[in-house]
């Protein structure tokens, strides 16, 4: 099976699932989501993804009736039905209503889940990045479906033959369109602190934990575009890409001064997923 989906009790192929036009994610982007990778009935970093998902739903006041263990069981059931051995899992909770009104105070919620096959590369090539001014609003720490600025920049990056775009806010690097970004400098890793300017990435947190375990000092502080361009190494982290080096920004060669250390961290992140798959 190439893809699988679920919506409020419906199970089936993506093209067979029907979503009502009253779903507020369509008109207002009134929804939160999360995404993970997995293998058969097991979801990588499952607990952290579900915790973030439920926290964001609560922050937006989206009402739901399931508990964490119930959502976990449902996601695993859907994964088993998909029969995919390695997949990208997307799950979304929207505030639904029967007519198009802005207020959603008394609305119930709808759960959408999709699964698609994915291949996680063991030794991917370094990334090419572009930079752009961060013009987003101040809710970047909530994983909502309002992704237009990220979509526009990701499209621009692809048009320029690049893999990702880096947001820069008043000279300060925040994050990428679908990833977190960190730099290695003089044996330290530097990454933007958690705030309403960035998504608290799960892969980001695992990378920082690995740095601490092997003796790399972790600095969670803002860093500038100039620091980015002159860093010893640049690391991009996400749920699906795990950890990747970047070697080009805006057409200029960057990093490359600590390749062994950067590769060690990338390999540690990949090994975690590989070990997860064979358990």
Tell where the protein language model's regions lie, with residue ranges:
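Short, internal active-site loops enriched in acidic
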Residues: 94-99
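Ordered, amphipathic secondary-structure segments that act as subunit-interaction surfaces
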Residues: 75, 80-93
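Helix-start/capping segments and mature chain N-termini
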Residues: 1-80, 102-279
């Amino acid at each position: 099976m190439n893809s699988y989906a679920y919506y409020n009790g419906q199970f089936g192929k993506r093209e067979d699932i029907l979503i009502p036009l009253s779903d507020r994610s369509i008109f207002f982007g009134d929804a939160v989501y999360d995404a993970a990778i997995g293998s058969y009935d097991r979801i990588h970093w499952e607990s952290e993804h579900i915790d973030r998902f439920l926290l964001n739903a609560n922050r937006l006041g989206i009402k739901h009736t399931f508990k964490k263990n119930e959502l976990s069981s449902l996601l695993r059931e859907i994964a088993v039905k998909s029969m995919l051995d390695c997949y990208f899992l997307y799950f979304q909770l929207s505030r639904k209503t029967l007519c198009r009104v802005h207020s959603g105070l008394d609305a119930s919620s709808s759960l959408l889940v999709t699964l698609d096959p994915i291949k996680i590369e063991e030794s991917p090539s370094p990334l090419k990045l572009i930079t752009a001014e961060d013009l987003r609003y101040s809710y970047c720490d909530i994983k909502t479906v309002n992704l237009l600025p990220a979509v526009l920049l990701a499209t621009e990056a692809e048009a320029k033959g690049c893999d990702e775009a880096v947001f820069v806010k008043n000279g300060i690097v925040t994050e990428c369109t679908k990833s977190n970004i960190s730099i290695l400098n003089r044996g330290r890793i530097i990454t933007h602190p958690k705030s309403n300017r960035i998504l608290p990435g799960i892969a980001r947190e695992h990378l920082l934990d690995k740095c601490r375990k092997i003796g790399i000092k972790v600095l969670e502080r803002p860093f500038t575009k100039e620091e980015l361009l002159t860093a010893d190494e640049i690391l991009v982290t996400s749920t699906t890409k795990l950890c990747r080096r970047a070697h080009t920004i805006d057409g200029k060669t960057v990093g490359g001064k600590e390749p062994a250390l950067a590769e060690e961290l990338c390999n540690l992140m990949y090994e975690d997923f590989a070990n997860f798959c064979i358990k």
